[in-house]
Amino acid sequence: MKFLFDLFPVILFFITYKVYGIYNATAVAIIATFVQIGWVWLRHRKVDNMLWVSLAIIVVFGGATLIFQDETFIKWKPTVLYWLFAAVLFLANQIFEKNLIRVMMKDQIRLPEPVWPRLNASWAVFFSVMGIINLYVAYNYSTDTWVNFKLFGFMGLMFAFVILQAILLGKYVEKSDDQEI
């Protein structure tokens, strides 16, 4: 359910684009992100930093799209977001010696210490590549194709990457004392 909630602005963007075009879809995505943050705040009295970053990026790039009536800005939004994620993962690890993937996943999975830096790096590379793929699709295909890819292509790539990670990590997962072998 959280997965669908996280996709709420993207799904509304997609539906609105199909009916009303890119500019209305952009406005809806901005509004939907504000609504999403409001809902999270009302329920938890706390909003994850990644949601705030998403809001800032959609407001800046979506706002530029609407002000200048140029869809190029909104097409850059996923790339900026993915590259920002990649940079944060990389820099947090290199400069602050903080493995953010480990911080986020340590309660869900137990891995040997040497695996965590590789997992962090693989996510940083994945987000970097996703940004490049977004630009490739945005500049080489129609806006309609880009919008379809934004929802279905990125979701498919993310799903495939998570499955691949699960398979590769399977051999490293440490059993806890209360798990049966």
Curated annotation (Swiss-Prot):
GO CC terms: plasma membrane
UniProt keyword Transmembrane present: yes
Entry superkingdom: Bacteria
Keyword line: Cell inner membrane, Cell membrane, Membrane, Transmembrane, Transmembrane helix
Protein's cellular compartments: Cell inner membrane
Coiled-coil region(s): none
Family of the protein in this entry: Belongs to the YciB family.
Topology versus the membrane: Multi-pass membrane protein
Main location: membrane
Name by which UniProt lists this protein: Inner membrane-spanning protein YciB
Task performed by this protein: Plays a role in cell envelope biogenesis, maintenance of cell envelope integrity and membrane homeostasis.
Membrane-crossing residue ranges in chain numbering: 24-44, 49-69, 72-92, 119-139, 149-169
Pfam families associated with the record: IspA
Organism in which the protein naturally occurs: Nitrosomonas europaea (strain ATCC 19718 / CIP 103999 / KCTC 2705 / NBRC 14298)
